[in-house]
Amino acid sequence: MAKNIQAIRGMNDYLPGETAIWQRIEGTLKNVLGSYGYSEIRLPIVEQTPLFKRAIGEVTDVVEKEMYTFEDRNGDSLTLRPEGTAGCVRAGIEHGLLYNQEQRLWYIGPMFRHERPQKGRYRQFHQLGCEVFGLQGPDIDAELIMLTARWWRALGISEHVTLELNSIGSLEARANYRDALVAFLEQHKEKLDEDCKRRMYTNPLRVLDSKNPEVQALLNDAPVLGDYLDEESREHFAGLCKLLESAGIAYTVNQRLVRGLDYYNRTVFEWVTNSLGSQGTVCAGGRYDGLVEQLGGRATPAVGFAMGLERLVLLVQAVNPEFKADPVVDIYLVASGADTQSAAMALAERLRDELPGVKLMTNHGGGNFKKQFARADKWGARVAVVLGESEVANGTAVVKDLRSGEQTAVAQDSVAAHLRTLLG
């Protein structure tokens, strides 16, 4: 017997019982995006490796440890995308979408990072990202955050997520802060773990993200990034906070929030939860006004965010069990008796024409009425349409409400209208 081939560790199959809730959540997200005027862009999952090295930063964990990089048959270095922003910017530059234009874009799809798989963190994971180009004021930053807050309300999880904000200022302000932070860390080098010692010179702001309790205690006395901000960044952040307060969106300023990718400036934010254990970040983003120019385009202000769908699904299931997947089937067509199958299939096609959007499944594989009604129940159907030999002969069908048990004989020409009333 041949040996079974299994999925790669950290790259999961999502089976029909799971994808139904994903589809409902994704549909909710897309409806909100449409209400804000955002347009979908579809991007390759493989890009040239230098794109990510240049965009994300060569001394980040993503580039150093986590990327799936390989050489193709032409000798080119390619990488499975670890995030979506770099590819979106590349596409915008390549297709002339960005210079002197406003763009509000979103994308959805799989990303890849070689991490230790655990609940809410996988090697293949799915993100929905939004990117806005050509707008530099705090109002668009606020709109993106308002959009995410509307998602949480639609999904019934608002009480379980908290917004954290910070401003990391301009490149020059961060350079000044970097020098002060390195000087502080050098004075306390003996209290740093090996990872922080390495980061201290390559990417010192990442030390602020350390989960080591001793390092966190040390950082209580470290210089604060907010003290080094340039005046424009201060004004931008104050404007953002004022807009969020006007919109009734609560937030906490987290001076240690810096984000893990090098391209950010000014606004950074995260929506976090206490309901998923250690994997607390649900959605995160910020400004990256220098990235378009860094990747070969003309200077273009930009802001965006990404959200991990695996974590979002886990959170919705954990805190809002009333948010159910849509039923697989609305109507189940039961047929029993000689020569009823062709009549049943013809009626099913007519109903699909007359009731667009309604999910109708026809029984196949035979079985008596009891077995067929059991199948209807298994698929979650609300209504059964029954054809037996007498119904075929009379040009009628029996429509049965599977919740109340009530049933009515209806002329086949009137079945669609009757179903429309039953299904609302």
UniProtKB/Swiss-Prot annotation:
Keywords, alphabetical: Aminoacyl-tRNA synthetase, ATP-binding, Cytoplasm, Ligase, Nucleotide-binding, Protein biosynthesis
EC number(s) per entry: 6.1.1.21
Protein name listed in UniProt: Histidine--tRNA ligase
Compartmental location: Cytoplasm
Catalytic activity as recorded in UniProt: tRNA(His) + L-histidine + ATP = L-histidyl-tRNA(His) + AMP + diphosphate + H(+)
HAMAP family xrefs: His_tRNA_synth
MF annotations from Gene Ontology: ATP binding; histidine-tRNA ligase activity
InterPro entries xref list: aa-tRNA-synth_II, aa-tRNA-synth_II/BPL/LPL, Anticodon-bd, Anticodon-bd_dom_sf, His-tRNA-ligase, HisRS-like_core, HisRS/HisZ, HisRS_anticodon
Gene Ontology terms: biological process: histidyl-tRNA aminoacylation
Gene: hisS
GO cellular component terms, semicolon-separated: cytoplasm
Recorded superkingdom: Bacteria
Protein family: Belongs to the class-II aminoacyl-tRNA synthetase family.
Assembly: Homodimer.
Primary residence: cytoplasm
